[in-house]
Amino acid sequence: MFYRNYLLFLLFLLASKVFSTEYEIQAEIVEIDTQKNLIKYLEKVTFNSNEISFKANKVIVNQNNERIDASGSPIELFFRENGEKINGQANKLQIIQNTLFLRDNVIIFRQGNEIKTQEVKIILKEND
């Protein structure tokens, strides 16, 4: 148990260099590829940060190009815009620096409206 918690803490520290924002990822299975500089989180994955939270089947953190890729059926996500909580879902999610991309059967719920599309790009706030 201690080893698993220590490993997850270490992974969090390594992965947190990807973004200027702090975040936490939890998963049933974690795989580290030190040659490709990838961390894979598999099964019941949850991602939480100040800006965005989501649940997915799989998340890959690529430290080479500062990118997070997630997939699910669907991914359930929550984010804030000007203090307003917005819910959504998509089959694919990507975070590159401070930009969130949602792809494949995207649905956004905002102010009682439902927006359906195949792709959405959202600029997240930069941290001070």
Describe the residue ranges of each PLM region:
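N-terminal signal peptide c-region/cleavage motif recognized by signal peptidases
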Residues: A15-S16
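Bacterial N-terminal signal peptides that target proteins for export
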Residues: M1-L7
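N-terminal amphipathic/hydrophobic interface segments
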Residues: S20-D128
